[in-house]
């Protein structure tokens, strides 16, 4: 080949590659433009939704030949990710189907595949939105009503399955019921008898299902003034009301009605037979919940009426608002703006609906979807964006919550305390306290004075003591927290009579002179292990006085701030470990922290958290200490349970971490073995990335990881057994004593304690569930008092 020819060939190759890149780039630009047009259709613009749809159909129809798969994918994604625009996209698909029947069939197949995949992967919300979309396609003459009813019937068949959890059956019934508002009218007009048959099957199931879980999930134990309805019961009542109204609802926008003359001419597709995947033990289904109600129409001022509790509009509005929070919760400003831009805000008292839904999220049982502070920050942004109305609605809601606090669930009480204190801190701690002063006449354990006391404790964490004292009326003096200062007994007037005073003073001098841990040990070694009457828990296995002198002196010297305390603990970590060899010694350390910092709850929380992180004290020691006689006076205070829950969470995180590491190691080992086997069989010796020894864990390493996980599981089980056993002991003792004395056992103390037991079950339900059979065998036996046993049975019913 001549040099010239070679040069020409190179030029042609370069031009070919450049043209190919240009085509790819142009195609990408068109795809991006199509995606943008589809995503934004139906949103606010100068033209109507209908004209937007007509324009978009023309664009998509022209591009179907080239970008068919891309369009299918975008539309099916929109169906799942933008359920609030369901009817806009079903209308779009209907218009495309009217023009291109083949594309309509391909889309239905694609949507069915998405639905089946969502069920298989346990993506329950995605499955429900896919089902809703398929149902709404009946309204657009894309899918036949008969084939949809067959699918709905198949889903209701799941309610008759044996030996599967009730939560599985519940979800399939819920998915069908929540779809009916979209398609009920069309099915009623075309297939009334088949629809009635479907509803009858649902009613039979709802009448026989167990609702043992109901009481565990209620925000309030009382049904006055608003019933605390179980979610399926409430939705069923709303569907029955919709049926009485001949399936006519007033909330869902239906743009396809404008195009009825076009859509009714289109050929319809039949859904294929869809069989729900069978139950597997590793499937996790959504847990049941109770529908939260705070307002009714009498609470709202003149203006649009709040839809009734059993109107389908209430369900649709609430579901839409919940979805907005789910979509935008990462950015509070956007979330607040989207909530206030609710499309149908002129038809409803929007501020009341938003506040009710935000509190429904905050008080959701067993746990809220997001952190408490997420909801608090959203409410603050709402108040900033709508200062004329929203603060008043929020104040009204707070008043309602406070007046109903007597029957409030203990977990929700804690969340209410956390939210209100945080909210006050963002609004200069301003509140009309005088309106609540009637609570001062009540017993200190009553929920109302207890609420104010706990709120002030939390406000103290967000401010300072003098500020709290100044903001409160003088009548509230008994509820104001004590000044948070250390009570260092070796500096008190009576210190001369204490056995460890001399060594304590030596230790102060040494630590201030920046002594080493070894020097501290040397100072402490002369303290005798006897003659210390102040520590009854010492059984001779550890030196209680040595712990007393060291812990109180060191932490008093570090009392200036959290950082000073942490630095002191870290520097003398080895001394702590040497002193805390047994669980009794660890409990003694906790006792001394409490003795020193009893007036500073937050300091106790952070110090114990630090000791757990540094493995100075074990989780089981903290649990035992919390239930000790010494802490009886603190037992109903919120901070003590904050300590217990952070202790349990720390143990849970440790187990989860070890579990994850073991799974990853096993996976790497399996891949390495598989890769080694494949390379031996590969005659061409074409290897992928080689598996190095560093990547592949040895079988011995995996075995050690298994042993560590097994030990962690044993410790976790022991922790739960300690906690639940102590609960059973103190509650049984209270009930027996009340019965013997002829007193009503239903005291404030009893309600707090039974509430805390329930809280441990619900807050840590995923971990406790693993040991439910052990708990049933060892602790929650049939001979236990029914009041205590019922809490366990309600917990088990959540996943039953």
Curated annotation (Swiss-Prot):
Residues 31-243 form the MIF4G domain. PANTHER family: CAP BINDING PROTEIN, NUCLEAR CAP-BINDING PROTEIN SUBUNIT 1. This is Nuclear cap-binding protein subunit 1. Disulfide bonds: none annotated. Keywords: mRNA capping, mRNA processing, mRNA splicing, Nucleus, Phosphoprotein, RNA-mediated gene silencing. Belongs to the NCBP1 family. GO terms for cellular component: catalytic step 2 spliceosome; nuclear cap binding complex; nucleus; postsynaptic cytosol; precatalytic spliceosome; presynaptic cytosol. The modification Phosphothreonine is found at residue 9. It comes from Drosophila melanogaster (Fruit fly). One of its GO terms (molecular function) is RNA cap binding. InterPro entries: ARM-type_fold, CBP80, MIF4G-like_typ-1, MIF4G-like_typ-2, MIF4G-like_typ-3.
């Amino acid at each position: 080949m001549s040099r010239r020819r070679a040069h020409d060939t190179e030029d042609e190759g370069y031009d070919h590659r450049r043209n190919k890149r240009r085509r790819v780039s142009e195609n990408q630009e068109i795809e991006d433009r199509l995606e943008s047009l589809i995503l934004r259709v139906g949103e606010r613009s100068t033209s109507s939704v209908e004209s937007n749809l007509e324009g978009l159909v023309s664009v998509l129809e022209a591009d179907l030949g080239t970008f068919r798969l891309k369009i299918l994918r975008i539309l099916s994604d929109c169906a799942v990710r933008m359920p609030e625009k369901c009817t806009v996209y079903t209308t779009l698909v209907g218009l495309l189907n009217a023009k291109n029947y083949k594309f309509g069939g391909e889309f239905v197949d694609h949507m069915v595949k998405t639905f089946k995949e969502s069920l298989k992967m346990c993506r329950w919300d995605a499955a429900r939105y896919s089902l809703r979309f398929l149902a709404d396609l009946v309204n657009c003459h894309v899918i036949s009503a008969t084939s949809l009813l067959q699918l709905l019937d198949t889903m209701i068949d799941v309610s008759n399955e044996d030996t599967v959890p009730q939560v599985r059956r519940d979800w399939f019934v819920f998915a069908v019921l929540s779809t009916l508002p979209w398609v009920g009218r069309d099915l009623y007009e075309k297939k009334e008898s088949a629809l009635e048959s479907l509803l009858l099957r649902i009613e039979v199931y709802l009448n026989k299902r167990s609702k043992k879980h109901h009481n565990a999930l209620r925000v309030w134990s009382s049904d006055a003034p608003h019933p605390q309805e179980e979610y399926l019961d409430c939705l069923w009542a709303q569907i029955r009301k919709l049926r009485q109204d001949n399936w006519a609802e007033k909330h869902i926008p239906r743009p396809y009605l404008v195009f009825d003359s076009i859509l009714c001419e289109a050929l319809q597709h039949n859904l294929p037979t869809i069989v729900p995947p069978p139950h597997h033990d590793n499937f996790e289904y959504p847990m049941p919940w109770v529908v939260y109600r705070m307002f009714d129409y009498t609470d709202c001022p003149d203006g649009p009426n709040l839809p009734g509790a059993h109107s389908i509009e209430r369900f649709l509005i609430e579901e839409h608002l919940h979805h907005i929070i789910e979509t935008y919760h990462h950015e509070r400003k956007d979330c607040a703006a989207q909530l206030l831009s609710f499309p149908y805000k002129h038809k409803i008292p929007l501020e009341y609906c938003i506040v009710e839904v935000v509190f429904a999220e905050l008080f959701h049982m067993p746990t809220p979807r997001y952190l408490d502070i997420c909801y608090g920050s959203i409410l603050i942004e709402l108040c900033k964006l709508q200062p004329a109305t929203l603060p008043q609605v929020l104040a009204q809601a707070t008043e309602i919550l406070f007046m109903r606090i007597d029957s409030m669930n203990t977990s929700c009480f804690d969340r209410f305390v956390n939210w209100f204190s945080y909210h006050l801190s963002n609004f200069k701690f301003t509140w009309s306290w005088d309106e609540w002063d009637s609570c001062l006449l009540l017993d200190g354990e009553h929920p109302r004075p207890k609420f104010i006391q706990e709120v002030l404790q939390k406000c103290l964490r967000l401010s300072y003591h003098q500020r709290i004292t100044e903001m409160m009326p003088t009548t509230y003096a008994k509820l104001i927290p004590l000044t948070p200062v250390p009570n260092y007994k070796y500096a008190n007037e009576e210190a001369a009579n204490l056995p460890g005073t001399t060594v304590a003073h030596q230790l102060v001098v040494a630590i201030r002179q920046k002594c080493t841990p070894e020097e501290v040990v040397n100072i402490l070694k002369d303290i005798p292990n006897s003659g210390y009457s102040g520590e009854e828990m010492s059984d001779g296995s550890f030196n209680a006085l040595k712990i007393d002198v060291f812990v109180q002196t060191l932490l008093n010297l570090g009392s200036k701030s959290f950082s000073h305390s942490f630095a002191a603990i870290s520097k003398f970590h080895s001394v702590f470990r040497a002193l805390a060899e047994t669980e009794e010694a660890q409990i003694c350390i906790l006792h001394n922290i409490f003795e020193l910092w009893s007036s500073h709850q937050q300091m106790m929380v952070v110090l114990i958290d630090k000791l757990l992180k540094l493995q100075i004290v074990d989780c089981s020691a903290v649990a035992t200490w919390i239930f000790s006689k010494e802490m009886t006076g603190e037992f109903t205070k919120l901070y003590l349970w904050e300590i217990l829950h952070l202790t349990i969470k720390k143990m849970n995180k440790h187990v989860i971490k070890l579990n994850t590491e073991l799974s990853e190691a096993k996976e790497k080992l399996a891949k390495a073995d598989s890769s080694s086997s494949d390379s031996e069989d590969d005659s061409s010796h074409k290897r992928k990335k080689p598996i190095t020894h560093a990547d592949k864990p040895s079988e011995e390493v995996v075995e050690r990881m298994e042993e560590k996980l097994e030990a962690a599981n044993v410790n976790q089980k022991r922790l739960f057994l300690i906690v639940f056993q102590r609960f059973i002991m103190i509650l049984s003792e209270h009930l027996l004593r009340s019965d013997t004395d002829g007193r009503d056992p239903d005291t404030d103390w009893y309600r707090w304690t039974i509430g805390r037991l329930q809280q441990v079950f619900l807050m840590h339900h995923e971990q406790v569930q693993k040991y439910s059979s052990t708990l049933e065998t060892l602790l929650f036996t049939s001979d236990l008092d029914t009041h205590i046993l019922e809490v366990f049975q309600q917990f088990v019913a959540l996943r039953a």
